[in-house]
């Protein structure tokens, strides 16, 4: 599939869900999957200029898909563990635009983790939660429901799922040029990046195989490049307190990785120190 070169491209899942939405929906509440979900309308003024859009495009183009990392993790021979995933019932706790967007990204990765491990029931459960969260952000749900139904019918066929995602990717192109939703997309992407690294570090911390550890350490070391791009993107939202606080934590993680000049210098102690910071941040985001 030409458009998906890194397995389940994060842009497909994230941006397709968002791009299908419009600004016409003003209902105070919407019903989704038999649950009444408050629609969050963020009224804080955000100025989004061409530079911000460029940084978003640049970050998306220069940060490997977090889902690609999950796909790589599935090839390391580490047993699937859905106890690490964010509880789908917790979506009701997320009552701000920021928390919903961040956790939409987190749920995207959890869904993808189940998908690359061929765990159909988990895929369906997380896909439904992704739909609820995207709907609660005021995004149009009709396409999501159509995709979800088709995905449910093809849970055992990874290629078919990828084709579905590839199809809706086409519809997300225009979204990248839509000023009003760049902030939301930035938060969704950040949530996905954090969750991907969280799962990688959690699972790598359980292995004793030296070759697998080396891969995990190299992966974490590589993040110093990508994390810099991500923090520069989030720097654009200085008028958003929650985003500033998140970015401060990301910068602390970057400051621990950046001085390490070679992946071979990443030992158990350093890996644990950085992993613990990632775990602490992730705990704040999903509470």
Predicted regions, residues:
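Bacterial signal peptide processing site
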Residues: 21-24
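Non-transmembrane, amphipathic alpha-helical segments
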Residues: 92, 96-99, 111-118, 122, ...
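Extended amphipathic alpha-helical interaction segments
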Residues: 155-237
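Bacterial N-terminal signal peptides that target proteins for export
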Residues: 1-8
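Secondary-structure edge/capping motif, primarily at the C-terminal ends of alpha-helices
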Residues: 111-118, 137, 141, 176-179, ...
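N-terminal Sec/ER secretory leader and immediately downstream segment
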Residues: 30-147
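C-terminal motif of bacterial Sec signal peptides marking the signal peptidase cleavage site
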Residues: 16-19
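A cross-kingdom marker for long, charged
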Residues: 231-287
């Amino acid at each position: 599939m030409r458009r998906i070169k890194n397995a389940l491209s994060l842009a497909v899942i994230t941006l397709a869900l968002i791009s299908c939405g419009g600004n016409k929906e003003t209902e105070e509440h919407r019903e989704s999957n038999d649950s009444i979900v408050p629609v969050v309308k963020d009224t804080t003024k955000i100025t989004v200029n061409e530079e911000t859009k460029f940084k978003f495009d640049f970050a998306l183009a220069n940060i490997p898909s977090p889902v690609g990392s999950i796909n790589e993790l599935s090839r390391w021979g580490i047993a699937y563990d859905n106890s690490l995933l964010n509880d789908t019932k917790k979506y009701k706790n997320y009552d701000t635009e920021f928390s919903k967007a961040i956790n939409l990204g987190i749920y995207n990765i959890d869904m993808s983790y189940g998908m690359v491990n061929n765990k159909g029931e988990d895929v369906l459960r997380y896909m439904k939660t992704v739909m609820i969260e995207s709907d609660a952000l005021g995004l149009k749900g009709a396409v999501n429901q159509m995709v979800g139904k088709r995905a449910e019918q093809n849970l055992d066929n990874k290629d078919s799922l990828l084709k579905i995602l590839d199809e809706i990717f086409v519809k997300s192109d225009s979204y990248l040029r839509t000023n009003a939703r760049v902030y939301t997309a930035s938060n969704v992407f950040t949530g996905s990046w954090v969750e991907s690294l969280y799962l990688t570090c959690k699972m790598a911390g359980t292995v004793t195989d030296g070759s697998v550890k080396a891969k995990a350490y190299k992966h974490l070391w590589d993040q110093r490049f990508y994390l810099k791009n991500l923090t520069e993107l989030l720097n654009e939202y200085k008028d958003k307190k929650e985003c500033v606080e998140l970015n401060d934590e990301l910068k602390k993680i970057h400051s621990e990785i950046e001085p390490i000049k070679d992946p071979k210098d990443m030992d158990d102690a350093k890996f644990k120190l950085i992993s613990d910071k990632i775990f602490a941040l992730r705990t704040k985001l999903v509470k």
